[in-house]
Amino acid sequence: MKLSGSSALLLLGFGLLGHASPLVHVQGKNCTVKPLGHGQDDVPNILHAVEKCGQTPGGRISLPAPYTYRINQRMTTHLESSTLEVGGMLLFSDDITYWVNNSYRIDFQNQSTAWRITGHDYVVDGGPERGGIDGNGQLWYTWAKGGSNVFGRPMPLHVLNSTRAVLRNIAIRQPQFWAVLVESSSHVELDNFYVNATNSDPNATEDTVWIQNTDGIDTYRSDHVTITNWVYEGGDDAVAFKPNSTNIHVENVTVYGGPGIAFGSLGQYPDRYDIVENITVKNANFQPSSQRAMNSGIYFKSWIGVNFGVPPNGGGNGHGYVRNVTVEDITFKDVQLPIYIDTCLSYLFDQNVTQYCDTSTFRFDDLHFRNISGNGLATPTNYTGRNITFAVSMICSKEAPCTDITFEDVDIKLPESYSGKSVLCENAGVQGLECNS
């Protein structure tokens, strides 16, 4: 039978994207994917390799260096007792309209994700050269123009419904939004990550440099998560413990720029009870980047106790607690607000929300800080509705005073020219530091 030219091309297209693709080499339990090139979408071939080798015990999918793989559509890779090697680079497409309209939605702050990894007993490994992700973030930074939580910006890596998972040796450059979200998962290890969000748009002049919302990693509804050996350079939280994050261990983290490590935000939704409990942060270093100031180091944030506005930037009157937290072996260099608690959170900056600063019922208890050194900049802030400066601020809500907060071997120097208060305490039971207020 003789095929017409158009029929032959059609069949060839099915061959490239279907099970007979010559760019997916299958040998037993091992699958290797080569990219199509020329901007063509590699997602179908990656998913085919995962189907063939990703759910078989001992299976292995390889996306080797030095190749770049185009991710032109959302994808879910389900792995069971297998390994995904990402030695190459996953480059997300620049089709903003597609991603805004088609990314996976999550039920927290109307956020979105682009690549979901689900399953159990799996490994995702970037290899010795740390392959990983290029989120094509610059176009998103310019598109959002410094707006907070602009709808539709997708997170490039979403660990979802996963148990006994290991992700290691991964670089994420120019994430579109938060780089990594671990959600509804348990016993997850994330080791040796590098995350960098850098803006090159000269129109960005404000303090955020348009790279806010480029968190390194957020945990949400997850238990027993280990985060070790991370380097983060960007414009937002390096690590953030979102609602119902329990038994989290963070160690050996270097942070360049942004707000630092956050416990929150919490208490945003009035119909939810948020718990953050059994958290350890050990051996973390904070300093400014070439683009972004180091706004804070370790901080805790809960929403106002009045449901004002709607998420992602409004809300409040949620309930819950942060309990059993240990923060130790911390170094600050030129950090504006080294350690503080904020119970007056809202992102409706043009509204008079500070009138609700003493309304939060969210509780912070059993917080312990030890072996902390470095310097703060005594930068003025008005997050409480007052103009204040400090090295440590434990200002808690009258409706939910903080209890059992201890400090041991803490030495945070402020500028010699600064003559104001260094330790602020209100509605807080603090031991180990002399409160000035």
Curated annotation (Swiss-Prot):
Keyword S-adenosyl-L-methionine among record annotations: no
InterPro entries, A to Z: Glyco_hydro_28, PbH1, Pectin_lyas_fold, Pectin_lyase_fold/virulence
Catalytic activity: [(1->4)-alpha-D-galacturonosyl](n) + H2O = alpha-D-galacturonate + [(1->4)-alpha-D-galacturonosyl](n-1)
Primary location group: secreted
Any one GO biological process: pectin catabolic process
The UniProt record lists the keyword Oxidoreductase: no
E.C. number(s) listed in UniProt: 3.2.1.67
Highest rank taxon of the organism: Eukaryota
Glycosylated residues in this chain: N30, N101, N110, N161, N196, N203, N244, N252, N278, N324, N352, N371, N382, N387
CC annotations in GO: extracellular region
Subcellular location: Secreted
Signal peptide: 1-20
Enzyme active site: D236
PbH1 repeats: 222-243, 245-265, 276-302, 322-343
Pfam families: Glyco_hydro_28
SMART domains (UniProt xref): PbH1
Keywords: Carbohydrate metabolism, Cell wall biogenesis/degradation, Disulfide bond, Glycoprotein, Glycosidase, Hydrolase, Polysaccharide degradation, Repeat, Secreted, Signal
Molecular function (Gene Ontology), one example: galacturan 1,4-alpha-galacturonidase activity
Disulfide bonds listed in the record: C396-C402
EC primary class: hydrolase
Role played: Specific in hydrolyzing the terminal glycosidic bond of polygalacturonic acid and oligogalacturonates.
Annotated family: Belongs to the glycosyl hydrolase 28 family.
This protein's name: Putative galacturan 1,4-alpha-galacturonidase A
Protein species of origin: Aspergillus oryzae (strain ATCC 42149 / RIB 40) (Yellow koji mold)
